[in-house]
Design a protein with these regions (language model features):
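A structural boundary/capping signal
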Residues: 1-263
């Protein structure tokens, strides 16, 4: 166990390890407003949840770092934690790690190995709130009024819909980020259109996670070289509306109504 894992007493770490971090993660998500996520062993990414094997529950942010009772981990480090757990529980199942995000209500209904309990969640909350050194690891959410599981939904795939709804409700342009080069870690990502944002006059960009330096959003996707285009956003938006009108309209209405309610 390395030094960054000693934010909490060992008996607590051992208990949270045995229950896959579920109570700790829910407690941390309640405190911070960040994203509840479960890592599963899955034969394929969209495998039914009843066929996947749960591994660990953690909290994510708008970046790629992961937080659980052991502290802050990058993706590569966290995978080294998950792989031995997957090997132990596989029972002959072949596959890889599938990371899925959930609301708290959804998480309570999942077929997890260990079910969360309110008493242990409250105990974890009390412990976390006493650990300033741990809480300092975690960034503050810019716009906690948007539930994290919804923000995650509008981060990938539906980012265009969010940007369009934000544009329609204001005066700023929706702009596509077109990628010509990724970092090595993201080198398998598709070149071309990647994400849509609202560009502000001060040069900052806004997506579902809030207004922030564009560089922060680029880092999330591992973008090195890129260009910006309002025309490309319009093209992608129209393509989505044309190809999947029911899905598009449902997604648009959902976020548009939420934005109106919090404006």
């Amino acid at each position: 166990m390395n030094r960054q894992q000693y934010y909490f007493d060992k008996p607590l770490l051992d208990k949270w390890e045995k229950n896959d971090g579920v109570n700790f993660a829910i407690a941390l998500a309640r405190i911070t407003g960040w994203l509840l996520q479960v890592d599963w062993l899955a034969s394929y990414q969209d495998e039914p949840v009843t066929d996947m094997i749960p591994l660990r529950v953690s909290v994510g942010t708008d970046q790629s770092d992961i937080y659980d009772f052991t502290g802050k981990k990058d993706l590569d480090t966290y995978e080294t934690i998950l792989m031995p757990i997957a090997a132990k529980r596989a029972n002959g199942k072949q596959g890889g790690i599938a990371n899925k995000f959930y609301s708290e209500e959804e998480l309570f209904a999942l077929p997890l190995r260990i079910k969360p309990t309110e008493a242990e969640i409250l105990e974890a909350q009390e412990v976390i709130l006493k650990s300033d050194s741990f809480l300092k690891l975690i960034p503050t959410r810019i716009n906690p009024e948007i539930p994290a599981h919804l923000a995650a939904h509008y981060t990938y795939g539906h980012c265009v819909v969010f940007a369009q709804a934000k544009k329609d409700g204001g005066t700023l342009p929706a702009t596509a980020v077109i990628v010509s080069r990724y970092t090595e870690q993201f080198s398998g990502s598709k070149l071309g259109f990647c994400h849509s944002v609202i560009m502000h006059p001060d040069g900052e960009a806004e997506d579902v996670w809030g207004k922030q330096p564009l560089s922060k959003i680029l880092d999330r996707y591992g973008i090195v070289d890129y260009s910006l285009s309002t025309e490309e956003h319009d093209r992608v938006n129209e393509t989505l509306k044309r190809n999947s009108p029911l899905v598009y309209n449902k997604s648009y209405d959902r976020i548009s109504n939420l934005l109106k309610s919090i404006s």
